[in-house]
A protein has these predicted regions:
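Short beta->alpha junction loops/turns
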Residues: 69, 238, 270, 274, ...
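Residues at or immediately flanking beta-strands
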Residues: 61, 94, 133, 232, ...
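Conserved protein kinase catalytic domain
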Residues: 77, 121, 224, 306-307
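A generic structural signal for secondary-structure junctions
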Residues: 81, 107, 125, 146, ...
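ABC transporter nucleotide-binding domains
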Residues: 2-5, 12-197, 201-210, 216
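C-terminal coupling/interaction segments
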Residues: 273-316
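ABC transporter nucleotide-binding domain
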Residues: 177-272
Length: 316
């Protein structure tokens, strides 16, 4: 596998007590879509900041296209395309001008920049809005324009920080299609996200991060099948879960082999051979004079993997 991006013991400390990224090791192959999945504060954005030269690492090293990110930041900027969380389009320019002047900034001639701009407007389905001010774009269109700008100079690696955050479901799906098209053209993509379905749908491999560390790495299917995260049993009674979760936790079978979490009136139980404990769960709840309102079993998801690794979900 030809390596497009490599991080070796990459670390960022803001103080002795605040370690944003802790000895991160990572290799991303050329043409791969790789995801960093984790909650806010996991270290994803800081990792992206170091890889894009915006944040100086405290220690460790990183290479993009074989170029040292710390020693040669100016050269690295020609190897990366970046789409940050915030809208960084020039509001004083039109859609077309945002692309054209980006090309000029990267050394394209007037004619080459104009030609590349026209190609990207077609590719990203923005031709009809070429003369529109960027302020008139919807969130999805603005994100497509930032993507088009980021790949203008054909970067080795495209780095996206929470690319669909704040988009409506339709715009999110449309952006997934655009990223899929870029990948089909051989573009290497690193994206950070806290959306499990996004990581599952887009990423060939992903790393689950929390508190600045990589907890697990693999394909989505590998993570779901190899980490022993098990299936999920969700049960809801006719009263708040606080009235019966302690009783469930007092059962030796449940407390030693399964992860239990209260979720409003329901309880989520994660573990292997989940169907074997259904009778124990229902009997325990009913012994408290309660009745079962809902019960369902679900196969492993990236969320259950994360919960099994951290004891909490991505939204906490």
């Amino acid at each position: 596998m030809e390596i497009a991006l490599q991080a070796i013991n990459l670390t960022k400390k803001y103080s002795d007590k605040v370690v944003a990224v802790d000895k991160l090791n990572l290799e991303i192959g050329k043409g791969e879509i790789f995801g960093l999945l984790g909650p806010n504060g996991a270290g994803k954005t800081t990792t992206g900041g170091m890889l894009t030269t915006r944040i100086l690492p405290s220690s460790g090293s990183a290479y993009i296209g074989g170029i040292d990110v710390v020693k040669h930041p100016a050269e690295v900027k020609h190897e990366i395309g970046v789409v940050p969380q915030t809208n960084t389009l020039d509001r004083s320019l039109s859609v077309e001008q945002n692309l054209y002047f980006h090309g000029r900034y990267f050394g394209f001639s007037r004619s080459d920049s104009k030609m590349r701009t026209e190609d990207l407007l077609r590719q990203f389905r923005l031709s009809e809005r070429a003369d529109a001010p960027v302020m008139a774009l919807s969130g999805g269109m603005a994100q497509r324009l930032m993507l088009a700008r980021a790949v203008f100079h054909s970067p080795t690696v495209l780095i996206l920080d929470e690319p669909t955050s704040g988009l409506d479901p339709q715009s999110r799906l449309a952006l997934w299609d655009v990223l899929g098209e870029l990948h089909s053209r051989g573009q290497t993509i690193l994206l950070t996200t806290h959306y499990m379905e996004e990581a599952d749908h887009l990423c060939q491999r992903l790393a689950i991060m929390d508190h600045g560390k990589i907890l697990a790495l693999g394909t989505p299917n590998q993570l779901k099948s190899n980490l022993g995260s098990g299936s999920t049993l969700w049960v809801e009674a006719n009263r708040d879960s606080s009235t019966y979760i302690e009783k469930l936790q007092s059962q030796d079978l449940l407390s030693t082999k399964y992860s239990l979490r209260a979720t409003g009136k329901g309880v989520t139980i994660i573990g292997n051979a989940i169907t074997e404990i259904i009778s124990t769960v229902t009997r325990t709840i009913e012994s408290q004079g309660l009745s079962i309102v809902s019960l369902k079993v679900e196969e492993p998801t990236l969320e259950t993997v994360f919960i099994s690794l951290t004891g909490r979900d991505l939204r906490e």
